[in-house]
């Protein structure tokens, strides 16, 4: 998929947001398997839908203006030896067409400033309790900065984003057809070569 594809999704979704609003989504987290290993990572589907970014510990902000911001991990050559390639801030900005990128370690410091003075904050409420608590904390800090402004409204965006994902683009439909073709050919090949008494 062309990376512009994800940027266009963000721009298209921003049109469904009220003016002076922001959408915040968080990535999946790594899940510890035992002391020093984790389960294979799978990105949150909604986060991937809008970013194409497949690293953990990330947060996306989409402004109603269409501006998009990504918080992610700094590039770390030592960590890459164990966990694989990392885009880092500049790499993520260039490859995934974000307007700005920041170190995820600065999220608690910068997000209240970024959402300060906005009318609405959208997210997928109830999906991740820990992230919901972060949202409330960031909103509280932002509201305290704007003593003469109305407080930011927290609104669930699940239905709007879900309806967007239901409608497939021509590119998505072509990929789905290709996937079905590969799966069908694999099943046909297995059936042609299956013999009595064979096991998996």
Can you describe what each PLM-predicted range is?
Residues 1-188:
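A composition/biophysics-driven feature that prefers long, compositionally simple stretches
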Residues 189-194:
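Short regulatory/linker helices and ligand/cofactor-binding micro-motifs at input modules
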Residues 195-200:
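Signal-transducing coiled-coil linker helices
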